Curated annotation (Swiss-Prot):
Gene source species: Chromohalobacter salexigens (strain ATCC BAA-138 / DSM 3043 / CIP 106854 / NCIMB 13768 / 1H11)
Classification via Gene3D superfamilies: 1.10.150.130, Intergrase catalytic core
Subunit structure: Forms a cyclic heterotetrameric complex composed of two molecules of XerC and two molecules of XerD.
Assigned protein family: Belongs to the 'phage' integrase family. XerC subfamily.
Pfam families, alphabetized: Phage_int_SAM_1, Phage_integrase
Sequence ranges assigned to domain Core-binding (CB) in this UniProt record: 1-83
The protein's name: Tyrosine recombinase XerC
Domain Tyr recombinase, residue spans: 104-283
Keyword hit for Cell division: yes
SUPFAM superfamilies xref list: DNA breaking-rejoining enzymes
Chief place of localization: cytoplasm
Function comment: Site-specific tyrosine recombinase, which acts by catalyzing the cutting and rejoining of the recombining DNA molecules. The XerC-XerD complex is essential to convert dimers of the bacterial chromosome into monomers to permit their segregation at cell division. It also contributes to the segregational stability of plasmids.
Keyword Cell division tagged: yes
Length: 298
C-alpha cells in the first residue's frame, strides 16, 4: 500500500511543493496504517465506510476541522489517482462530506467604547458629516457593507430604511434617533458633492457612489483618528449591532429579521452571548437556579 502512495507522490513531484508532498505523505500514510490495522492491505478494498471510519477516528483523536478538511482533500486526490489507475471504479471520498469549518466571528466592540467613538466630534466638512452618517447607519441598522453602498436616497424616509439583502430579499429597518440626526446633517451637505442625477445615498469627493473598498478604508482611518484601539470594519459594526441588541432584548427572532437572516441558526451563531450573560439569564429564569432566602432559624 505504501508503494502506491509513493507512486502517487512521484506523479505530483513536478506540480506540488515539497511541503504539500510531505503533508500528503503524512495523510496517506495515516490512512494506510488505519486500514492495515483493520486487516485491509489492498487499496482496491477502499470504500466510503472505511473513509468515514478513518475520518471519525481522526476527529476523535482531536484533529481540528481545518486539518480534517485538508486530510480529506489529500485522500480525495489520491482516490482520483486510484480511479485513473484502474484500481478503483469510483472515488469513495467524494461520497463523504467536507468537515464544517468553525465560523470565526469578529469580537463585538464594547458598548461604552463604541459610544465614545461615535460621539467623537468632527470638523463638520461634507466628508466628515458623510462619514458620521455612515457610521451611525451601520450601527443603527446592522447593515452589510454591500447593503450600505447600494443605498439610494429614495430608500429612506424619516424613520425607516428599505434594504435589499442577500438573495434579493427586501426588508425594512427602523432608524435610530442618532442615525436620523446624522442623516439629516448629511442631506443638508450632500448636494455639495453629488450631482442632481446621482441616486446614491453616499458619494465620494467626485460625486460618484462610494465603493466597498473606500468605505472600509474610511472606517479603519476613523478608528485610528478617534483613538479606538481596535481594528474596525463594517462586519464588526454589524456584529456589534446584533450582539448589543440581543443582549438587551433577548429577542432572537427580532434580531434575525433585522439582520436579514433566512435561518435562525445563522443568527444563533452570529450573535453569541458572553458566558456571564447566559449564566445571569439562567439564574434569573430557571426555577431550580433561583436563589431563595435562607430559612428562618427562629
Amino acid at each position: 500500500m505504501h508503494a502506491a502512495v509513493e507512486r502517487f507522490l512521484h506523479s505530483l513531484s513536478g506540480h506540488a511543493s515539497p511541503a504539500t508532498l510531505d503533508a500528503y505523505r503524512r495523510d496517506l500514510t495515516a490512512l494506510a496504517r488505519f486500514l492495515e490495522a483493520s486487516g485491509i492491505d489492498d487499496w482496491a478494498a477502499l470504500d466510503v465506510a472505511q473513509v468515514r471510519r478513518f475520518m471519525g477516528a481522526e476527529r476523535t483523536r482531536g484533529l481540528a476541522p481545518r486539518s480534517l478538511a485538508r486530510r480529506r482533500a489529500a485522500l480525495s486526490r489520491f482516490a482520483d489517482h486510484l480511479v485513473r489507475s484502474g484500481i478503483l471504479d469510483h472515488n469513495p471520498v467524494a461520497l463523504t462530506q467536507t468537515p464544517r469549518q468553525p465560523r470565526h466571528l469578529p469580537r463585538p466592540v464594547d458598548v461604552d467604547q463604541l459610544a465614545r467613538f461615535l460621539d467623537t466630534p468632527h470638523d463638520g466638512t461634507p466628508l466628515a458629516v458623510r462619514d458620521q452618517a455612515m457610521l451611525e447607519l451601520f450601527y443603527s441598522c446592522g447593515l452589510r457593507l454591500a447593503e450600505l453602498t447600494a443605498l439610494d436616497v429614495t430608500d429612506l424616509d424619516a424613520r425607516r430604511l428599505r434594504v435589499v439583502g442577500k438573495g434579493n430579499k427586501p426588508r425594512q429597518m427602523p432608524i435610530g434617533r442618532r442615525a436620523q440626526a446624522a442623516l439629516a446633517d448629511w442631506y443638508r451637505l450632500r448636494g455639495q458633492l453629488a450631482g442632481h442625477d446621482e441616486p446614491a445615498l453616499f458619494v465620494g469627493q467626485r460625486g460618484a457612489r462610494l465603493g466597498h473598498r473606500a468605505v472600509q478604508k474610511r472606517l479603519a482611518q476613523l478608528a485610528r483618528e478617534r483613538g479606538l484601539a481596535e481594528h474596525l470594519h463594517p462586519h464588526r459594526l454589524r456584529h456589534s449591532f446584533a450582539s448589543h441588541l440581543l443582549e438587551s432584548s433577548q429577542d432572537l427572532r427580532a434580531v434575525q429579521e433585522l439582520l436579514g437572516h433566512a435561518n435562525l441558526s445563522t443568527t444563533q451563531v452570529y450573535t453569541r452571548l458572553d458566558w456571564q450573560h447566559l449564566a445571569d439569564a439562567y439564574d434569573q429564569a430557571h426555577p431550580r437556579a433561583r436563589r431563595r432566602a435562607p430559612p428562618d432559624d427562629t
